[in-house]
């Protein structure tokens, strides 16, 4: 938070005074945060994110972190001479790729996040979908967005069957910050790679979260001219799907966000993780950042 330390004392007091109503309003509430994009690869942004999560916990909120790891997985696959393939925003995951995904997400990325949170003064525990039976999954049946008669085989990519949040709630009650890798398990104990945005959205619904915040590499959802769309309803999102404005990796992100909004998550925000402390600005100020998704 070096940029915050340089702020004049009078301005700091003003910021804290503005945050107080939101601290009161969200005290005891669950905030599910999908952590991904440049915020995961830039060391300064990594430290900022960890400090922001710890701050939310210290002021009485219950942050739950679900992380991605696409760039790190891609780097590991490249080292093995294996080329990544995506269909409709989902990584095709054969058995070898699944091993790499598990190792990178649970063994590398997750532990880095947990370590940074500890360094910032918080207490974090890393989980995968196997821990406490958190995420049960099955093979994803993927059909073409435009022609449902076309089906794709994406390997060990998972579709969530159920989420048992008891282990997450137990950690929250013990003042820990859960850090979750998006890996599920199936009936035969097989592992599944699940899109982190989808996991975050489903988990936010099950936990009855106050907010779902998705950190991305863009200012939010952009129209075809590149302008930010600050507020989107289900009907508007359907139109953006139909005309191809929302495509690729944004498809599962927006679909999951909309599902969470429809299921009762009070606020769903897609914000720019490249902006230092963007999450705090979204949660603790009256300034609107990024795109807000509403069911109607």
Swiss-Prot record:
Cellular localization per UniProt: Cytoplasm
Chain ranges passing through the membrane: none
Pfam family, one: AA_kinase
Top-rank EC class of the record's enzyme: transferase
Recorded catalytic activity of this chain's protein: N-acetyl-L-glutamate + ATP = N-acetyl-L-glutamyl 5-phosphate + ADP
EC number: 2.7.2.8
GO MF term set: acetylglutamate kinase activity; ATP binding
GO biological process, one term: arginine biosynthetic process via ornithine
GO cellular component terms, semicolon-separated: cytoplasm
Site annotation Transition state stabilizer: residues: 34, 253
Main location group: cytoplasm
Entry keyword set: Amino-acid biosynthesis, Arginine biosynthesis, ATP-binding, Cytoplasm, Kinase, Nucleotide-binding, Transferase
The keyword DNA-binding belongs to this UniProt entry's keyword annotation: no
Pathway: Amino-acid biosynthesis; L-arginine biosynthesis; N(2)-acetyl-L-ornithine from L-glutamate: step 2/4
Chain residues that bind substrate: 69-70, 91, 193
Cross-referenced InterPro entries: AceGlu_kinase-like_sf, AcgluKinase_fam, ArgB, Asp/Glu/Uridylate_kinase, Glu/AcGlu_kinase, NAGK-C
Stated role: Catalyzes the ATP-dependent phosphorylation of N-acetyl-L-glutamate.
PANTHER family in the record: N-ACETYLGLUTAMATE SYNTHASE (PTHR23342), N-ACETYLGLUTAMATE SYNTHASE, MITOCHONDRIAL (PTHR23342:SF0)
NCBIfam families registered for this protein in UniProt: argB
Stated family: Belongs to the acetylglutamate kinase family. ArgB subfamily.
Name of this chain's protein: Acetylglutamate kinase
Native source organism of the sequence: Delftia acidovorans (strain DSM 14801 / SPH-1)
Protein encoded by which gene: argB
